[in-house]
Amino acid sequence: MDKKIGLFWLRDDFRFIKNHGLIEATTKHNQVVVFYLYKKDVFNYQEAQKWWLSKSLSNFKKKLNELNITLEIVETNSFKNFFDDLINKKDFAIYWNKVYEPDYLKFDKYLLNILKNKKIDHKRFKGNALNEIDEVKKGDGTPF
């Protein structure tokens, strides 16, 4: 087991089983911290989504507590600012599942580049989509 802290960035994938990022963090590290970045401005006028999110986080936290894993909910205005601060800490590895929205994909590209340049252990996993876009091919091997 790796002595570094394993961080799992919980996004919009609240599966407990077959959550590949969470599985990777818990099998490779003795200490795991799960964190959710809450951007208040995203939910300003979306009361139903806030309710769903609070219930999902509460249920996920209960399951994590059974495994002695902490869930930290961090309110931030910017993913970039949060990760710029986090990257200055050295003894961690980070895992997360992909979110397929364009803004998230753009940020993932930025984050993957920064983590690689800083030589921080990291891995992004397929999200809760059935197939990645580039995995679906026609019979002749070309994309649809």
What are these regions (language model features)?
Residues 69-78:
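Short beta->alpha junction loops
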Residues 1-70:
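N-terminal beta-strand-loop-alpha-helix module at the start
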Residues 78-144:
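Beta-rich, aromatic/charged-enriched effector core domains that present basic-aromatic interfaces
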